[in-house]
Amino acid sequence: MAGINRAGPSGAYFVGHTDPEPVSGQAHGSGSGASSSNSPQVQPRPSNTPPSNAPAPPPTGRERLSRSTALSRQTREWLEQGMPTAEDASVRRRPQVTADAATPRAEARRTPEATADASAPRRGAVAHANSIVQQLVSEGADISHTRNMLRNAMNGDAVAFSRVEQNIFRQHFPNMPMHGISRDSELAIELRGALRRAVHQQAASAPVRSPTPTPASPAASSSGSSQRSLFGRFARLMAPNQGRSSNTAASQTPVDRSPPRVNQRPIRVDRAAMRNRGNDEADAALRGLVQQGVNLEHLRTALERHVMQRLPIPLDIGSALQNVGINPSIDLGESLVQHPLLNLNVALNRMLGLRPSAERAPRPAVPVAPATASRRPDGTRATRLRVMPEREDYENNVAYGVRLLNLNPGVGVRQAVAAFVTDRAERPAVVANIRAALDPIASQFSQLRTISKADAESEELGFKDAADHHTDDVTHCLFGGELSLSNPDQQVIGLAGNPTDTSQPYSQEGNKDLAFMDMKKLAQFLAGKPEHPMTRETLNAENIAKYAFRIVP
């Protein structure tokens, strides 16, 4: 037999060559014991090696394997390249001292005081985030939904918080209604991690559901023997998902990470909604109100009273608003910019403004007596306003006069007071009281920082003058009505969400978005309660210059 290994008495291995084929000269010179193409060629002994009669050291694993029976080409290549020698193996077995053992760890060099100072803020944020999660769980919020909405808020996408989530988030993120939630906020980052852990804990503690039986298929219904056959293997290749476990299938269920934005309200102030409140939802709500038989003039009066004087909306109109999906009240802590009643109010003013004045339904008004009976004791005739609703029992002269000014644009204070104050001697005091409530705000108009009309009409701000654009595209006042710099009865301003020093010009980063409005209507709104209509912070004549910007031609 060719290539049989034999061992002598001393335990040294030698090769017996029985191949009858002649060997090459190189093989004769080197004393190689095999020249077959099927066996590896043993390298010749170096010149400085001891003679062959000296006792040879025990062969290594490579030599023993090379002297074995005929090997394949892959085995020879692995033998020549991959198998380690004895020297390599001994080197690999030496213990090596790592650099980490030679040098102390960085954590060991830190002092306890420095570590405590560096980790204290993060521990505070973690504890705060955990308390928010506990509050959400105790209020029954959907933690998975909260986690998704928080992710959208940090990314600047649209969100749809529930009432519970919105109330809790406003407690811990007070600037959320105006500026959203920053992705760099440490509390937001820790809260996102706490919500992720809470979702995983809920998933782990949930009861295991039995997998839904899948419909029978040729691959799934075949017997065990056929599964092990060639046909069974082919069937599994054609339908690979049939053989997966239920856990694998459940883990690969697609998750919609971009929820649809239908009926979702942006957490940041939407400039498009601020420029034009008559959007599709408001128009659809108006159509629904008309189908219910609601008088649009009565609706406009109720909305103006609720927005400007914070008077409750009548029950019948409130019920109709609820039927079209609009909350008939504005919470004290809610921004007016984001409330659908403002959208409805703007759309309603646009719709009624398109109608001829002769076709408008009359507003509820005080019964008008004959002209002969309207003379005052001093011989003067009463001044009748175009819109003069009935006076409420709880309204004093100042409150009723401010409401008349709001309902009758262009009418002066004296004319409005003369319309409902019968005693001529009492009129000057009422006029002074109304001006005292309005003038401190309106008198600041000329002192405000300016924004040119060209800058206001840029794509960033998007102001559109009613004198230059179509009615459907013009900018409306936050409290209703089209805005135009050519209207002498209006003081067009842009009210910012953030205050800045009066020496600084407007900047998107510092002041955030602008809400365009008539400063006269803003003064009437602040006469009832001096608070910012968007942030609910204190807004009066002393600090309005830090928020407002005058739009100039």
UniProtKB/Swiss-Prot annotation:
Induction: Transcriptionally induced by HrpL. The record marks 479, 525, 533 as: E2-binding. Auto-ubiquitinated. Residues 1-308 are annotated as: Host recognition. Residues 242-255 have a biased composition (Polar residues). Effector protein involved in gene-for-gene resistance in tomato plants. It is recognized by the host Pto resistance protein and elicits Pto and Prf-dependent hypersensitive response (HR) and programmed cell death (PCD), resulting in host immunity. In susceptible plants, acts as a virulence factor by suppressing PCD and HR-based plant immunity. This function requires its E3 ubiquitin ligase activity probably by recruiting E2 enzymes and transferring ubiquitin molecules to cellular proteins involved in regulation of PCD and targeting them for degradation. This is Effector protein HopAB2.
